[in-house]
């Protein structure tokens, strides 16, 4: 099989966003805030000019090709996050025992889940993630897609039902909508 000479991925930078590259650390600043991330990979080089970020690898093997695509996606998500932000919407569902959900600092507390006396807790990941509860709707917003997604998963996993038939006991907090929305 013939090896490719190089693979280059180009990511456009919007006008409101600034990308700074220091070695393998990429910093993206925009209206929503700032995200830093270290992409330490031996063969891959990341460079930028005013308009584009370039991710390049010379004589790649299969893993290097995959890593170039992964780094491109991460940088694209960072740029989109600081420019627009990410919003996940969840719905509180219960049949008999009305659960109450509260945000206390960096913890989401779920009381009275299936009538349990002890509250269930979910951790909010990252400093930029905001969780709000209005009625039966839970909204998670932030600029880092990974932190927003992991916080959503933590809340969903906190209400996982064990030892009961999941076809009957469908109480929980479930993802309803994933959106990339404009920052206010």
Curated annotation (Swiss-Prot):
It comes from the Archaea. One of its GO terms (molecular function) is rRNA binding. Keywords: Ribonucleoprotein, Ribosomal protein, RNA-binding, rRNA-binding. Belongs to the universal ribosomal protein uL6 family. HAMAP family: Ribosomal_uL6_A. One of its GO terms (biological process) is cytoplasmic translation. One of its GO terms (cellular component) is cytosolic large ribosomal subunit. SUPFAM superfamilies: Ribosomal protein L6. Part of the 50S ribosomal subunit. This is Large ribosomal subunit protein uL6. Coiled coil: none annotated. InterPro entries: Ribosomal_uL6-like, Ribosomal_uL6-like_a/b-dom_sf, Ribosomal_uL6_a/b-dom, Ribosomal_uL6_arc, Ribosomal_uL6_CS2. This protein binds to the 23S rRNA, and is important in its secondary structure. It is located near the subunit interface in the base of the L7/L12 stalk, and near the tRNA binding site of the peptidyltransferase center.
